[in-house]
Amino acid sequence: MSSLRLLASAARRATTHVAYTRRGYAEISDKLKLSLALPHKAIFSSQDVVQVNIPAESGDMGILSSHVPSIEPLRPGVVEVVEDSGSQKWFVSGGFATVHPNNRLTINVVEAAPLEDFSIEAIRANLQEANKVAAGSGSEADKMEAQIEAEVYEALQHALAK
């Protein structure tokens, strides 16, 4: 065999034994990027968190990274933000949560405050007052407003009792 044929034969055998590396998927983040915003300020702005629990109208939901995209209306209740260092609880009056396909969660609410800022005694007193106005002889608008207040105070009282 000529040296050229021997070299060509060896080159063919060498290329058939090359290990091909398989192409894999991109790394998926195990964190969720949370944005929690009020009309006048942002509480969280694209902050990495482990999990967020929300009071959706359809029931309480826990949201992790890679959650199915959805839009959820929120009822008055507690939004719990779980981070590596612990968790924070915020009482929200209602709003919307949008789970985006790229591990982002946007929560827009009208009002929010840290749960520890509330006093159970003040909540009970305000709930009694709201129930009194709702059952009173005032205008229909006043009664409806008081009923909405009572619903929010009941949700807040329930959240503080946990």
Swiss-Prot record:
Keywords: ATP synthesis, CF(1), Hydrogen ion transport, Ion transport, Membrane, Mitochondrion, Mitochondrion inner membrane, Transit peptide, Transport. GO terms for cellular component: mitochondrial inner membrane; proton-transporting ATP synthase complex. Residues 1-25 form a transit peptide. The keyword Transport applies. Transmembrane segments: none annotated. Pfam families: ATP-synt_DE_N (PF02823). It is found in: Mitochondrion; Mitochondrion inner membrane. The keyword Chloroplast does not apply. GO terms for molecular function: proton-transporting ATP synthase activity, rotational mechanism. CDD domains: F1-ATPase_delta. Its main location: mitochondrion. HAMAP family: ATP_synth_epsil_bac (MF_00530). F-type ATPases have 2 components, CF(1) - the catalytic core - and CF(0) - the membrane proton channel. CF(1) has five subunits: alpha(3), beta(3), gamma(1), delta(1), epsilon(1). CF(0) has three main subunits: a, b and c. Belongs to the ATPase epsilon chain family. Mitochondrial membrane ATP synthase (F(1)F(0) ATP synthase or Complex V) produces ATP from ADP in the presence of a proton gradient across the membrane which is generated by electron transport complexes of the respiratory chain. F-type ATPases consist of two structural domains, F(1) - containing the extramembraneous catalytic core, and F(0) - containing the membrane proton channel, linked together by a central stalk and a peripheral stalk. During catalysis, ATP turnover in the catalytic domain of F(1) is coupled via a rotary mechanism of the central stalk subunits to proton translocation. This is ATP synthase subunit delta, mitochondrial. It comes from Agaricus bisporus.
